């Protein structure tokens, strides 16, 4: 696993893979699923409404995963990923605002619920599925296991970080917890927009060549 860190041409693919995997978790998806019912209750929904909203979140996630089996082979990874990350960031900020001003209007709890459900939907269109397989499209056969292992480590690291920090964040800063997730997710969007090349229709060798100069690489310019 350490050899892949010493190869300059693999550093950018590794950074992209690990940031995607970690960002998948630090976008707050597990905070939403782990604490969805609590979130809905804090938003002012009743016990029954909270249960229905939580079930609906899981149902949307499953339906999106099934639809992506059809969409992924036909659509570029870059637009799906960037669109998903950007909209997810906006929805997280909207969720923070809706929960902050939950008592401002009687319909505000429903804005909160819609923001959560929409977030789960857009997450499933890119940020959810793409990080899991992107290493197979960015690394050639020899370094691929190491690249995927580092990505998995980043994923679980992000998962652990959110699981440990979110309860405290929720208690200390309340709704602003989701503003933290929104900021981190927007940072991921900027990094991926600058450096993530389209991998659909390209071999891993071609992707590695495009990213061979590390952070000095310009994947979009090279593709043009």
Residue ranges and their predicted role:
Residues 1-224:
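Alpha-helical transmembrane bundle of multi-pass membrane proteins
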């Amino acid at each position: 696993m350490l050899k892949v860190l010493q190869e300059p041409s693999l550093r950018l693919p590794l950074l992209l893979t690990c940031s995607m995997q970690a960002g998948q978790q630090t976008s707050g998806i597990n905070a939403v699923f782990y604490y969805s019912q609590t979130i809905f209750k804090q938003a002012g929904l009743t016990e029954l409404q909270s249960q229905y909203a939580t079930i609906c979140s899981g149902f949307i996630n499953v339906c999106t995963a099934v639809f992506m089996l059809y969409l992924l082979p036909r659509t570029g990874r870059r637009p799906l990923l960037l669109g998903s990350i950007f909209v997810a960031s906006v929805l997280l900020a909207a969720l923070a605002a809706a929960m902050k001003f939950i008592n401002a209007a009687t319909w505000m709890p429903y804005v909160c619920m819609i923001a959560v459900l929409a977030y789960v939907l857009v997450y499933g269109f890119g940020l959810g599925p793409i990080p899991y397989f992107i290493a197979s499209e960015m690394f050639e056969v020899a370094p691929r296991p190491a690249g995927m292992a580092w990505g998995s480590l980043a994923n679980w690291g992000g998962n652990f970080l959110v699981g440990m920090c979110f309860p405290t964040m929720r208690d200390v800063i309340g709704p602003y917890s989701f503003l933290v997730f929104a900021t981190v997710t927007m940072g991921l969007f900027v990094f991926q927009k600058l450096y993530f090349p389209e991998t659909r229709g390209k071999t891993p060798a071609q992707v590695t060549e495009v990213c061979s100069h590390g952070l000095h690489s310009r994947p979009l310019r090279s593709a043009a």
